[in-house]
Amino acid sequence: MAVPLLTKKVVKKRSAKFIRPQSDRRITVKESWRRPKGIDSRVRRKFKGVTLMPNVGYGSDKKTRHYLPNGFKKFIVHNTSELELLMMHNRTYCAEIAHNISTKKRKAIVERASQLDVVVSNKLGRLRSQEDE
């Protein structure tokens, strides 16, 4: 099993999502973030006690950006030939099997990954136990 190259701790500055202002009051206003552009908007004018706006200061550290908690970056894999791209980068990237891959191909990908010493982040997904078969 490959050991991650990253030794620095991954720190997320903010865990809560930035939600759209007044999305909690109206059904028609969805939660996905939109920048407020109104002339009287309290959020745009940054009043105290209102919804926070995303800005550059909330970004994570450049050295740990896009890293998973296990210390690897994610690379989505659809077949075993794509898995072989990670052979030389197995300490930086881990494979993640795409969501639309069948159980049969998943087993082949997981088996090939163990031969190449590549970590698979979702290797237990959609695998049946002996009792079900």
Swiss-Prot record:
GO cellular component, one term: cytosolic large ribosomal subunit
An example molecular function term from Gene Ontology annotations: mRNA binding
Gene Ontology biological process terms in this record: translation
Keyword Ribosomal protein applies: yes
InterPro entries named in the record: Ribosomal_eL32, Ribosomal_eL32_CS, Ribosomal_eL32_sf
Keyword Heme (UniProt): no
Pfam families linked: Ribosomal_L32e
Family: Belongs to the eukaryotic ribosomal protein eL32 family.
Protein name: Large ribosomal subunit protein eL32y
Taxonomic source organism: Arabidopsis thaliana (Mouse-ear cress)
Gene name in the database record: RPL32B
